[in-house]
Amino acid sequence: GLAPCELCLKQRTVYWVAGAVAIVAMIVVRLPGGPRLREASCWLLALVFLVSVGVAGYHAGVEWKFWPGPQSCSGGGTVTVAALRDLLNGGGVKMPACDQPAWTFAGLSMAGWNTVASMILVGFSVAAALRERGRT
């Protein structure tokens, strides 16, 4: 597998939040009076995915050298427990730098593709919210 940098981990956090929002929304809309909250849930998911567009777009911009990344993203940032264990066992483990894409496809890094995917998810969420608005 590819070791994630600090900004990669921040991108994952947004998806954990989206998953939590979606699970809570699925439960709430089944409660009495809950169906009225479907539209709001869709708008909230759109907002979460819009944050994802920002985080992933920022990371892609760092990779393309459009702007500098955070100081902690220079390849020596946060160390995970697994990395610390490997280091204690004699292996030198270094967090990857945020400005070095670990993988690219069709000219886009994983951060670039995440930006595209997040934009699509914003579109789906907005479309679902507007569809719910039309039902009420």
What do these predicted ranges mean?
Residues 1-3, 22-25, 61-64, 89-90:
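Immediate flanking context of iron-sulfur cluster ligation sites
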Residues 2-17:
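Loop-to-helix transition at the N-terminal end of transmembrane alpha-helices
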Residues 12, 41-45, 114:
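Alpha-helical transmembrane segments of integral membrane proteins
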Residues 23-33, 126-133:
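Structural signal for the C-terminal ends of transmembrane alpha-helices
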Residues 31-53, 123:
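Interfacial segments of alpha-helical transmembrane regions
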Residues 50-66, 84:
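C-terminal TM-helix exit segments that contain a strictly Trp-centered aromatic cap at the helix terminus
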Residues 64-109:
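Extracytosolic (periplasmic/ER-lumenal) interhelical loops and adjacent juxtamembrane/interface segments
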Residues 93-136:
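A hydrophobic membrane-anchoring alpha-helix module
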